[in-house]
Amino acid sequence: MQNPRLKQHQQQQQQQAMMQQQALMQQHSLYHPGVLAPPQLEPVPSGNLPPGFDPSTCRSVYVGNIHTQVTEPLLQEIFTSTGPVESSKLIRKDKSSYGFVHYFDRRSAALAILSLNGRHLFGQPIKVNWAYATGQREDTSSHFNIFVGDLSPEVTDATLYQSFSVFSSCSDARVMWDQKTGRSRGFGFVSFRNQQDAQTAINEMNGKWLSSRQIRCNWATKGATSGDDKLSSDGKSVVELTTGSSEDGKETLNEETPENNSQFTTVYVGNLAPEVTQLDLHRYFHALGAGVIEEVRVQRDKGFGFVRYNTHPEAALAIQMGNTQPYLFNRQIKCSWGNKPTPPGTASNPLPPPAPAPVPGLSAADLLNYERQLALSKMASVNALMHQQGQHPLRQAHGINAAGATAAMYDGGFQNVAAAQQLMYYQ
């Protein structure tokens, strides 16, 4: 059965696409058809508008990712296609320029956002959105930022912000966009005024469905959410709502997602109880048997840890198993990929198996003897069913029977360990 929220979101996306298509059909033919390629019908990244910003009265649009060959007269001529332009301003940069277009009426500006966002100008998709002063948006430079990955292509700043606004101190949300394609890079950042809210958001939102995908949440690397402030023609500082490129976040150093990148071998473990130690986490993942563990770290004050495996498939299996296993200290842990790949050439140094968990009244030697005794008991019962007419040839060769082996365990000795192991493998 389809998720009602997902169904409702899909209906909204379809309605938005229909509105955009109608706007395109109504608009006048554009200038320079050889320079400006037809648009791609994609959801408009409406963004998380700042408090105090009223788009119903806005007549100005921001234009980002402009090709360096574009001139200011050409920019104004193109945007005149949606309505009369009052003024325009182009700010040149080395890699790509940006600018602002001021219309006489809001309808022309809204139509420009609907019809021109994503259009390719000299082979480069431009981004068009409402323009507003930076002062209207809260300064989040000192806030606590989290990384949100595996975002669906249709998720915008506004969608992301709405999903995390259930946490009272959520202050901002931004989806990162690829300047070359004009599409979402599949991840973004959410800011919080309160550190505890940020941690709670990581714990509670990791693995939750947002649109058509399960998102993953983690702490963001310092400086990963920085964006470039822009200056408008009247000197007011303005920032683009959907800022984002491969240079905006350290998480984008590798173009591939962790799921498809063999260099990612570390598992992020969230929602840990305060009393969980490094040894506890090691025991938990060792018991899963997903693979060879090479490193275990725990940040007890922040409630998360990391488990590094020898290979990528082992880490992937650990994530899958960790999210479906019983609780650890009465909490359901949440596993996802770590945000950094294992550096190439890292030496393999497997950790030794962790010491068994203490049981009241029993020593480690007692537990080891008990495990051996249990294995022999199972071996004897299976052997009795399979070889009722005679002894197993290996048992005959070594002179062992079930009762004798069990007695040897109680006497504290076990001279035929190798023989018993052979019996366990060959029965």
From Swiss-Prot:
Low complexity bias locations: 9-23
Domain RRM stretches: 59-133, 144-222, 265-340
Origin superkingdom: Eukaryota
PROSITE patterns linked: RRM
CDD domains associated with the record: RRM1_PUB1, RRM2_PUB1
Pfam families, alphabetized: RRM_1 (PF00076)
InterPro entries: Nucleotide-bd_a/b_plait_sf (IPR012677), RBD_domain_sf (IPR035979), RBM42_RBP45_47-like (IPR050825), RRM_dom (IPR000504)
Subcellular localization: Nucleus
GO biological process: cellular response to hypoxia; mRNA processing; stress granule assembly
A molecular function GO annotation: mRNA binding
Keywords: mRNA processing, Nucleus, Phosphoprotein, Repeat, RNA-binding
GO CC list: cytoplasm; nucleus
Modified residues (Phosphoserine): S246
Region (Disordered): 1-23, 223-261
Record PANTHER family: POLYADENYLATE-BINDING PROTEIN RBP47B (PTHR47640:SF9), TRNA SELENOCYSTEINE 1-ASSOCIATED PROTEIN 1-RELATED-RELATED (PTHR47640)
Description of how the protein assembles with itself and partners: Interacts with UBA1A and UBA2A.
Purpose: Heterogeneous nuclear ribonucleoprotein (hnRNP)-like protein that acts as a component of the pre-mRNA processing machinery. Functions at multiple steps to facilitate the nuclear maturation of plant pre-mRNAs.
Protein name: Oligouridylate-binding protein 1C
Organism of this sequence: Arabidopsis thaliana (Mouse-ear cress)
